[in-house]
Amino acid sequence: MRSKLSLQIAGFCATLLLGCLSVAEADAAAIAILEDIQGAAGKHGAFDELKAGDRIELGTSGSAVIGYLDSCVRETITGGIVTIAPGQSQVEGGAVTRETVACEATQLVLSEEEAGKSATVSFRGPPWEKHVRQIVPAQSPLVMAAGKQLEIKRLDSEEPAQKVKLTGGKADLAAGNIALTPGGFYQLTAGDRQMVIKIDPAAQPGALPAMSRLVRL
């Protein structure tokens, strides 16, 4: 029979292991999105989320467009070896140009905690503005979510809900020719996750840069 001390040690070790796993998961959070990649070998594809330390080999003529989620820096890189790092990429043997664009970090209205509290009221009625987590400057967002299906329901107008297949955790409304109404409020649902977004009244149509229309549910 196990002694009380042995059980305490086992419990402590289990707690320590869970803590280490949580830290590792946090460290492995995506910090960038690969908007486009051409002429490069490897496993990476368009709209992949990238973590610190990820490497992309572009060879001599391959190219990639990478958007950084926190800094809103968008890079166009030709050739070389790219290593994902906080804020911007490290590029060896290639050419890179950078610009700052509108992105999720500048579009968020509510923090995740505030959005969670807002969701508990089940979005019962207006004003919808108080439930909005993100204002999106594009009519066709790129939604990343867990699950197999995304439901899009307009809150401020009587319209049929739209259901979109999630492929690899992504639903690109631009690729599906789905445009949401500028100024409209929409509830996004995937599995047990929900959030409310507002489409900016001046939102642009079409496939804008991915990081400018990215919504992470």
Where are these predicted regions, by residue range?
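Flexible, surface-exposed loop/linker segments and immediately adjacent secondary-structure boundaries
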Residues: 27-51, 55, 59-65, 69-159
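Edge beta-strands of extracellular beta-sandwich domains
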Residues: 71-75, 193-213
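Beta-strand-rich extracellular modules
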Residues: 61-63, 189-193
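N-terminal secretory signal peptides that target proteins for export/translocation
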Residues: 1-6
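Short, solvent-exposed mixed-charge patches
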Residues: 215-217
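Aromatic sugar-binding surface patches on proteins
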Residues: 167-176
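Bacterial N-terminal signal peptides
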Residues: 10-20
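Surface-exposed, short loops/turns at beta-strand junctions within beta-sandwich domains
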Residues: 176-187
